[in-house]
Amino acid sequence: MNILTPVAERLPSREEAEEALAVLRRWATHTPASDVAALAPEAPALVYPDLSRAYPRTFTVDEAYKASLPDLQNGPASLIVGAKAVIQHVGISNFRLPIRYHTRDNGDLQLETSVTGTVSLEAEKKGINMSRIMRSFYAHAEQAFSFEVIERALEDYKRDLESFDARIQMRFSFPVKVPSLRSGLTGWQYYDIALELVDRGGVRKEIMHLDFVYSSTCPCSLELSEHARRERGQLATPHSQRSVARISVEVRQGKCLWFEDLLDLVRSAVPTETQVMVKREDEQAFAELNAANPIFVEDAARSFCQALQSDPRIGDFRVVASHQESLHSHDAVSVLTEGPTFAAESLDPRLFSSLYHVG
């Protein structure tokens, strides 16, 4: 006697399952996703194509394929998320590359440089293709630095991105060989410098920033120490501390201000720069130098101001000084600006903490 298995109870073969899946996928190709999901909760996963997991090393991109790639940043205004508002700065920060700088003594230095490039974005534009900023800068990176070279890079990415305003900032550590005070030794002092080219409303400004590290001896503490010695024969020492001034200057149009020129100005204003190579005679000289130039943070700001005012190549400027106190558990700070370029109602909450220079 033969026993027949009902068709409903028979398991489909693999071949039958593959045919059914192919039919389901063909149907899903021309069916709204909501209808596919309504068929069964697991249906969307079943109809998803089987993708290759191996990296296609031999695949090449032709013009037709490139043209088919989605470009969301250049999409219509309907894709904008949030308010349709103008963005003053959008771009990339801290891409690094070696840049060649010319020095005042007719030498060249190649220094690792951190570059930030931004443009303005109109309210009706979705976004920008940020890689264009990098490509524009790289096109000029082999040339020795000058503000004219930066201007050409800025012109390129303003044109490529169809933006009205743009900015390039370059940050690097600039080495200068400096002599000790008395021993005749020399050592390398490194200065944090940043250069900016700002194009806003068709007006361009060249800006240079310099961090200058110096020692500040408190004039009050110096007098109190001398009083103790004189009146009571009591040995006492005044307090002094490492201090930092961030000097920002606008270079007047058509003028050339070398990095070394700005260094000379700030050194003449406050001569107690921290030292590199120090023997005993240098340490004694530094103590004498500090005693001859005691300085409050207010004095420092005004001394830098006087030096900057004396140079006709410098327009607007700002001095931010921080005396990182050895007496107090807080710092003494000052900000002095001249001209509208650096004037601001608000200060960056982390402005003064950015002035700490650590090894």
UniProtKB/Swiss-Prot annotation:
Gene3D superfamilies recorded: Urate Oxidase
Catalytic activity, EC: 3.5.4.16
Enzyme class: hydrolase
Molecular function terms from GO: GTP cyclohydrolase I activity
Reactions accelerated catalytically: GTP + H2O = 7,8-dihydroneopterin 3'-triphosphate + formate + H(+)
Recorded superkingdom: Bacteria
NCBIfam families: PRK13674.1-1
GO biological process, one term: tetrahydrofolate biosynthetic process
Site residues (May be catalytically important), renumbered to this chain: 218
Protein name: GTP cyclohydrolase FolE2
Pfam families registered for this protein in UniProt: GCHY-1
Entry similarity comment: Belongs to the GTP cyclohydrolase IV family.
Residue intervals passing through the bilayer: none
InterPro entries with a match to the protein in the record: GTP_cyclohydrolase_FolE2 (IPR022838), GTP_cyclohydrolase_FolE2/MptA (IPR003801)
This protein's UniProt keywords: Hydrolase
Coiled coil regions, renumbered to chain: none
Cystine connections: none
Reported function: Converts GTP to 7,8-dihydroneopterin triphosphate.
Pathway: Cofactor biosynthesis; 7,8-dihydroneopterin triphosphate biosynthesis; 7,8-dihydroneopterin triphosphate from GTP: step 1/1
